[in-house]
Design a protein with these regions (language model features):
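Long, well-ordered mid-to-C-terminal structural blocks that present hydrophobic/aromatic surfaces
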Residues: 291-359
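Charged, non-catalytic interaction/linker regions at domain boundaries
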Residues: 2-293, 300-303, 403-446
Length: 449
């Protein structure tokens, strides 16, 4: 292992364990009807009770009438800005600070990310981002960092495609923080990342936004739950911070089932080029965005596996339409619409060489399959029959499949994971969610020759 002198470090101090982290401070301005007040502003990442970016304003000289009427809702703050950038949103709380002779407000932006540093013309050579609640992975390479007299292993994963390179890096505190997350839940910084052009040339804010948006869905698909790059900072050739984009982690800690085995990080390195090639296509970007969104919600088992069954099959049908109709033109839109749901699944899975048989890892489904029971022809038939019993109140089998809901939920998600991997041209190994397995135990995807 080589000693790592890498410049890649967090751009903000998330290590203190505080529930509110200062990201930026500057000049603030608010408008109460026709009156404009100037003061100081701060942008913070608040982690409790739920992670959010909030803006805080501290204003002197606010008239008593405006302060009172705003506090009781008779007047509204019509605009709030920091450094001349108006931030659309709404006031959460307000009130006087008698000791400081100030009127303070807390403002929630309408959407994230929030940007007041840099603009569309800003050029940068690298972007540093932060990952909260990612997985405890073994890197594709390893370095060391010193902490006091001790040397610690640092894990790195390198992703590359189409002239871009992305590095994911663990921290000295990663393993300890993941243990705390497993015990306490919540939000903790576990990894940082860096985006650069392979030739070290500059790129624009739009380039950075596009790459970060793709990484949001790629990394979330790898984890099996929302895990997006947040609080990105762009640096120019001199190392100056020229662009900042602040956002919050979407979900608190969860450790869902997923195809990605964290001890085999080469899996995501291998998938990345094919995924981003699909992502670069407008139609496929929209399809993957929808499908992965449904996948992530379906995979959150505590929200209900019956709902997860329905969401998963909506995602499979969407994937089948994009692949079978729009890309391969195997049939028309009308022809696709006229198919049974099970045939839409068969069309996709057969085309991608994903097996149709009900697997032995779902013994309760296998028990119900024979002709003297449900007479299910294959897994698509079983999955769609169970889904139909949930969504159609008049279904003759409604309420009769409770003992196989978990297997149907898990099998449907396995098919969805395999479909996404195959469509992205992946032919490596994966962790099979259908099997009880150790971390590090993987197998080849079914279509690998």
């Amino acid at each position: 292992m080589d000693t790592d002198k890498n410049r890649l470090k967090p751009a903000f101090d998330f290590s203190s364990g505080e529930s509110s982290v200062l990201l930026y401070q500057g000049q603030a301005e608010m408008r109460i009807e026709g009156n404009i007040y100037a003061g100081d502003g701060k942008i913070r990442l608040d982690l409790l009770p739920r992670a959010n970016i909030h803006l805080y304003g501290y204003f002197s000289g606010v008239s008593l009438k405006d302060a009172m009427e705003t506090s009781i809702g008779q007047k509204e703050i019509s605009s709030f800005s920091i450094n001349g950038h108006q931030i659309e949103g709404f006031m959460i709380s307000s009130g006087p600070n008698a000791a400081a002779q100030q009127y303070n407000i807390k403002w929630c932006p309408k959407s994230e990310p929030v940007t007041v540093v840099g603009d569309d013309s800003t050029q940068m050579t690298r972007v540093v981002f932060h990952l909260f609640n990612f997985v405890d992975l073994f890197g594709t390479r390893r370095s060391t960092e010193q902490n006091g007299t001790a040397m610690h292993a640092i894990e790195h994963v390198d992703l590359a495609c189409d002239g871009w390179k992305v590095e994911l890096k663990s921290l000295l505190s990663t393993r300890e923080d993941i243990k705390k997350l497993e015990q306490e839940g919540g939000y903790r910084l576990t990894h940082i990342g860096e985006i650069q052009k392979a030739d070290q040339t500059s790129f624009t804010r739009k380039d950075a936004d596009d790459c970060l948006y793709g990484l949001r869905f790629f990394l979330s698909f790898a984890k099996g739950g929302w895990c997006e790059p947040i609080c990105a900072v762009g640096f120019d050739t001199s190392g100056n911070r020229v662009w900042e984009s602040w956002s919050s982690p979407k979900d608190s800690w969860q450790n869902p089932l997923t195809w990605f085995d964290p001890h085999n990080s080469s899996q995501i390195s291998s998938l990345f080029p094919g995924f981003m090639k699909r992502w670069a296509d407008d139609d496929w970007r929209e399809a993957l965005r929808e499908v992965i969104y449904w996948y992530l919600n379906a995979n959150f088992s505590s929200r209900g596996i019956d709902a997860g069954i329905i969401l998963t099959q909506a995602a499979i049908e969407r994937l089948s339409y994009e692949y079978s109709v729009k890309e391969k033109k195997l049939l028309t839109s009308k022809g696709f619409k006229d198919l049974l749901a099970s045939d839409k699944f068969r069309l996709l899975f057969s085309s991608l060489r994903i097996p149709l048989d009900i697997p032995p890892e779902t013994p309760n489904l296998q028990t119900l399959a024979p002709a003297d029971q449900m007479n299910w022809l294959d897994a698509p038939h079983a999955l769609t029959e169970i889904r139909n019993s949930l969504v159609h109140p008049e279904h003759k089998r409604r309420g009769q499949f409770g003992n196989v809901y978990y297997e149907a939920w898990n099998l449907g998600l396995w098919y969805l994971e395999m479909g996404i991997l195959a469509i992205c041209g992946y032919s490596g190994t994966y962790g099979n969610r259908l099997r009880q397995r150790w971390v590090g135990q993987t197998e080849d995807v079914p279509w690998k020759e």
